Amino acid sequence: MHKKSLLKRIIIFLGVLGPSVVTTMAGNDGAGVVTYSVAGAQLGYAILFTLPILTILWAVTQEMGSRIAIVTGKGLGDIIRERFGVRIAMFIFAMLLIGNFGNIITNVAALKTSSEMLGIPSFPFIVITILFCFMLVTLTKYEKSQKVFLTGMVFYIAYVFSAVKSNPHWGEAVGALFVPPQGLLTKDYLIVSIAVLGTTITPWGQFFVQSYMKDKNVPISRLGYAKLEAFTGAFISNIFAFFIIIATAATLFAHGVPLESGEQAASAIKPFAGEFAGILFAVGLVNAAIIGIIIVSLSSAYAFSEFFGFTGSLDDPYKKGRIFYINFLFNMVAAAILVLTPWFPLFGIVIGTQVLNGVLLPLFFYYLLKIVNDPDIMGKYVNGKRYNYFTVASTVFIAFASIAAIAISIFGV
């Protein structure tokens, strides 16, 4: 009897599985891989100390978004527009759209560089990739596209093999997760830590998980399983972040080789870990960039539909959800055109995107907490006192980190 009950619970969990896992794994997109690679090369195993903290923060924020979607049946854009007015909604939407677009540009740039490392001409590869992404989203229903997204996550195993081939000191790496490193409060450590935080917990991720969970139509009776899924997704995602960091920490940092551009990591680790490890790293980056392009573009399409009251669902046929799908395509095509333009100031766009995300993230969490603690919206599913203490403390921490990121980006302090 107990075995049947356990099997039933596993089946139910697998039925709920998807939104949070897809969102958190997409956090390891091209931009995320670039950030983790640079972090490992600059600080070595020491930066691993941030991962357990970020895993908890990420899981908690994802869980709140999932819970709001299941209880209300609405996306975040819908609720902000309805509860806080059009002006606030338009301000948040404008900043989200610009920040998302910068992130899409970063992912297309990562796709371009990594494809060239593999000897693939970037222009036709980017065109074919965008066509594939558009056809995948428009020609498949929610369940099928979700299976493709989850299957794509398997390719992150490339980073596990790449890390193993780098011959790291496993005891030192695992210990770094729990032991505060020397220089914890130095400028360099704080800057890199903020960058890792910024690539992990993002405005687009919070909007996407709620819209995607709403699109899945998970019943409220499955709320506990959705919470478990949020924590599972954050844990699995940062396991892969752990291996990405190790791959560059055990090679580039260990040999004092500087790395300023994460896209070059695949080439840089070859002399130390071998040709195969470099190829695996590049393949992983291609996969991560494609997933990032799709998910962040979908985040913008969902948000546009919610803020302006249009239909937006992966289960809608193209004719019914035309605006949703056109918005999705526009973000990808526009980003590709800019990346393929030789004179385009990519570095400035990346910095500007970080600043915008830094402004939006504390603001977003302010409204997220107001929504999740409003009994008129959430009924009995508002945050409990202890949970709320932790979420408020987490929000304050994220806000201070975001402010620090803005100061560093603008003033270089």
For each feature predicted by the language model, list its residue ranges.
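Flexible loop linkers connecting adjacent transmembrane helices
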Residues: 2, 35-40, 63-88, 113-115, ...
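Loop-to-transmembrane helix boundary motifs in multi-pass membrane proteins
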Residues: 86-87, 123-128, 232, 236, ...
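Hydrophobic transmembrane alpha-helices that form the core helical bundles
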Residues: 67, 71, 89-119, 126, ...
